[in-house]
Amino acid sequence: MEQDLIVSLGQRALEMTLLLALPVLLSTFVVGLVVSIFQAATQIQEMTLSYIPKVITAFLVIFLLGGWMMRKLVDFAVEIFANIPVWIR
């Protein structure tokens, strides 16, 4: 395998990882920010108040977008495995 091919595969794998992780990370970030602003405004310093909404949000996003995420991941894996014979030559 050539160096360019390996770098390209690594780059595409990182892009896929970012694409699949971004919805969960972004939604939990927004919920955490909103809860933190609420806690600062009301002076409530309960740790579980910030943790539980983020976990619920992450599960909800995975539940709603899980099919799309799996489809993207399977398509990527199928493409990788289908091209292995071409890359070996």
From Swiss-Prot:
Top-level lineage group: Bacteria
InterPro entries: Bac_export_3, FliQ
The UniProt record lists the keyword Cytoplasm: no
Signal sequence residues: none
GO cellular component: bacterial-type flagellum basal body; plasma membrane
GO annotation (BP), single: bacterial-type flagellum assembly
Subcellular location: Cell membrane; Bacterial flagellum basal body
Membrane topology: Multi-pass membrane protein
Regions crossing the membrane: 18-38, 49-69
Main location: membrane
Family membership: Belongs to the FliQ/MopD/SpaQ family.
Protein name stated in the entry: Flagellar biosynthetic protein FliQ
